[in-house]
Design a protein with these regions (language model features):
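Cytosolic, long alpha-helical scaffolding segments
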Residues: 2-128
Length: 128
């Protein structure tokens, strides 16, 4: 549309009123859950064979991915007029998945902070 010689972007009110793709939030939740599993497996691997620089970088990347996933979910929630679940429930699930990933990553990084070179049987059991 051209107004006063300027191209104006089309505004589609229906895209704001209609719900997003049916499975969008569930897909975002699935991706976050898979990231939690990936981070937990990395923690297990670290407990079994030690924390290396490469594994530390992987943990930091996983932590960053979790943050990005949370932001994407909340951004989509803020854009959506109609949602498949209650807004509070979507936010709660997204934040909990983020916190799970963050805590696992923090546990991995704390191995270095506290200079733990040997891992107890309890730590190994927790990791398995």
């Amino acid at each position: 549309m051209v107004i006063g010689g300027h191209n104006m972007p089309k505004f589609n009110l229906m895209s704001y009123i209609m719900p997003p793709e049916d499975k969008m939030f569930f897909t975002l939740f699935q991706n976050s859950a898979e990231l939690c599993i990936e981070t937990a497996r990395l923690y297990t691997h670290i407990i079994e064979s030690g924390l290396t620089t490469e594994k530390k970088e992987q943990i930091l990347k996983a932590k960053k991915k979790g943050s990005i996933s949370l932001k994407l979910t909340l951004k989509q929630l803020n854009k959506s007029f109609i949602t498949p679940l209650e807004r509070e429930d979507i936010q709660y699930i997204a934040v909990r998945l983020y916190k799970i990933n963050k805590r696992i990553a923090k546990a991995c990084l704390n191995l270095e902070v506290y200079r733990l070179l040997k891992y107890t049987e309890e730590m190994k059991e927790q990791a398995s």
